[in-house]
From Swiss-Prot:
Binding site for ssDNA: 156, 188, 190-191
Binding residues annotated for ATP, in chain numbering: 89, 122, 124-127, 180, 277
UniProt gene name: dnaA
PROSITE patterns found in the cross-reference section: DNAA
Upper lineage: Bacteria, Pseudomonadati, Aquificota, Aquificia, Aquificales
Family stated for the protein in its record: Belongs to the DnaA family.
UniProt-recorded name of the protein: Chromosomal replication initiator protein DnaA
Stated consequence of mutating residue 190 to A: 1.7-fold decreased affinity for ssDNA, very poor unwinding of 15-mer dsDNA
Domain of life: Bacteria
Pfam families named among the record's database cross-references: Bac_DnaA (PF00308), Bac_DnaA_C (PF08299)
Length: 399
């Protein structure tokens, strides 16, 4: 029997059949006609007609199934509700990033895509990404926020469990993807391949992608050219904290911690902080121990860093002022990078604190020095033993 003849038989039983059958997907498989119903009601309607009104030989030609609904992908968004666009403090250095994100939220995926925000540590990138996520979620969009490091770790876990398709489907089902700390994709080749395919899928579906990094895409060493090219394919926005914005943030944080400080303390905070994390850390310490407690702690930390520099200078027989200068001879350069490394490992100093102690404008040099020491330790056993020896000596003598 041909399909047209079969349909006429069904239509002869029910006057509404012509309209109802338009809702079905009809396939011919293994000598049978498969009618795929869009829902339970349609399936029951056709089964009733087939089983009640059609002859046995015709019934054998028909199979009725209900359309299988795709399982809804469960999304863990990792958003912190404390970050909002309303409490993001806007100034000259971050206004463009803020405005671009706000505009993108009005036209997800079609106006600026991707958005790549870059700037130093603690300039508000995470706050802005989280705030964008919370705003989009409030409007009913599906959102995921993740750091590149967390993305990599989750991917590895899913590979081990054999559930990598679940991981891919979760990321590919969102309306807004927020990836923070993009610099941590560096050197992770398998992670980059996975992210590249997720990025492409979302981009082709016109879903919004917002990325944040501590450096411009061109400076992302160890990240593939094709990913860098994708990052540069949208809009690049630098984010900075100028003095006026930092002053606003200090005032806001003081309100948050219910503190009133005299002008000279606020001036001290302005002069001795570069980012939001430092501001928050120092205000917390003032709340706990008072301004004098903060001064004592910072003096002690600075002294420890200088003791590390002096210790390394003595070992390498170079001058402290040479380590703190821009001298580039081999001996001084090695002493400098090891001193920076020990300041981080032995004293747990922040990158910015180390940069300040070594009279550097930002922490990029410090990151490079620490990475250089770690890479050389992997390649050179003698160097590894030397660094281990100096680390133990510094810890015993200074900390």
């Amino acid at each position: 029997m041909e399909l047209n003849a079969l349909i006429k038989k069904i239509e002869s039983v029910d006057s509404y059949a012509r309209e109802f059958l338009k809702k079905f997907e009809i396939k011919q498989e293994k000598g049978k006609f498969l009618f795929i119903a869009p829902g339970e009601d349609y399936r029951e309607w056709l089964e009733t007609i087939v089983n009640t009104f059609l002859e046995e030989e015709v019934r054998k030609l028909i199979e009725v199934k209900e359309k299988e609904e795709k399982k809804k992908v469960e999304i863990k968004d990792f958003l912190n509700p404390k970050y909002t666009l309303e409490n993001f403090i806007v100034g000259e250095g971050n206004r463009l990033a803020y405005e671009v994100v706000k505009e993108a939220l009005e036209n997800l995926g079609s106006l600026y895509n991707p958005i790549f925000i870059y700037g130093s540590v603690g300039t508000g990138k995470t706050h802005l990404l989280q705030a964008a996520g919370n705003e989009a979620k409030k409007r009913g969009y599906r959102v995921i926020y993740s750091s590149a490091d967390d993305f990599a770790q989750a991917m590895v876990e899913h590979l081990k469990k054999g559930t990598i398709n679940e991981f891919r489907n979760m990321y590919k089902s969102v309306d807004l993807l927020l990836l923070d700390d993009v610099q941590f994709l560096s050197g992770k080749e398998r992670t980059q391949i996975e992210f590249f395919h997720i990025f492409n899928t979302l981009y082709l579906l016109e879903k919004q992608i917002i990325l944040a990094s501590d450096r411009h895409p061109q400076k992302l060493d160890g990240v593939s050219d094709r990913l860098v090219s994708r990052f540069e394919g949208g809009i690049l926005v630098e984010i900075e904290l100028d003095n006026k914005t930092r002053f606003k943030i200090i005032k806001e944080k003081l309100k948050e911690f219910n503190l009133e400080l005299r002008k000279e303390v606020i001036d001290y905070l302005l002069e001795n902080t570069k980012n939001v994390r430092e501001i928050e850390g120092k205000i917390k310490l003032i709340k706990l121990k008072g301004f004098e407690g903060l001064e004592r702690k910072e003096r002690k930390e600075r002294d420890k860093l200088m003791q590390i520099v002096e210790f390394v200078a003595n070992y390498y027989a170079v001058k402290v002022e040479d380590i703190l200068s821009d001298k580039r001879n081999k001996r001084t350069s090695e002493a400098r990078k090891i001193a920076m490394y020990l300041c981080r490992k032995v004293c747990s100093a922040s990158l910015i604190e180390i940069a300040r102690a070594f009279k550097r404008k930002d922490h990029t040099t410090v990151i490079h020095a620490i990475r250089s020491v770690e890479e050389e330790k992997k390649k050179d056993r003698k160097f590894k033993h030397l660094v281990g020896f100096l680390e133990k000596q510094a810890f015993d003598k200074i900390c």
